[in-house]
Amino acid sequence: MLTISMKAKLSALWIFFLFNIIFRDIHEFVEPGFIEEIMTGTSNGNPITEHMLLLGGVMIEVPIAMVLFSRLLPYGANRWANIIVAALYGVLIASFGTTDLDDVFHLVMESAALSFIIWSAWRWRNPSIKKHSMSQEALSGRQLH
């Protein structure tokens, strides 16, 4: 059976989450009237401002950073960063009210990814404790002989 490190699994889940966000946004462009609305300088009836664009950039940059942080952060910081960020994004995407079937589909996929990130990070046990206990067992075994 193929085993994958927890860091790689969490990073892959963030990539899956990002792909769903990106393709949902791309999908919006084929919705009738979407491009025309954007060309008027509004989105969902709200004016498109520099602040709104900056907020959108920050909101997408956090999951992008989590792809990298999931690979690079040490165990404790990694585990809690994944739990906290995934929980915050879960609340955020749940607050988006939508009735479009394609949006609902992507929302379900994003929610599933975030749930699995939280579940995986929560169940993740400190690998150094396991290594330490294994080395203690090895030392104990040598002393008995």
Annotate each predicted stretch with a short phrase:
Residues 17-51:
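Hydrophobic transmembrane helix segments
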Residues 60-80:
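Juxtamembrane helix-break-helix junctions at the cytosolic face
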Residues 1-20:
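Cytosolic juxtamembrane helix and N-cap/initiation of the first transmembrane helix
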Residues 50-58, 108:
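Structural signature of hydrophobic alpha-helical transmembrane segments
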Residues 58-66, 86, 110:
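Core segments of transmembrane alpha-helices
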Residues 78, 89-107:
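Membrane-helix boundary connector in multi-pass membrane proteins
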Residues 102-120:
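Alpha-helical membrane-associated segments of multi-pass integral membrane proteins
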Residues 114-135:
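Membrane-water interface at the C-terminal end of transmembrane alpha helices
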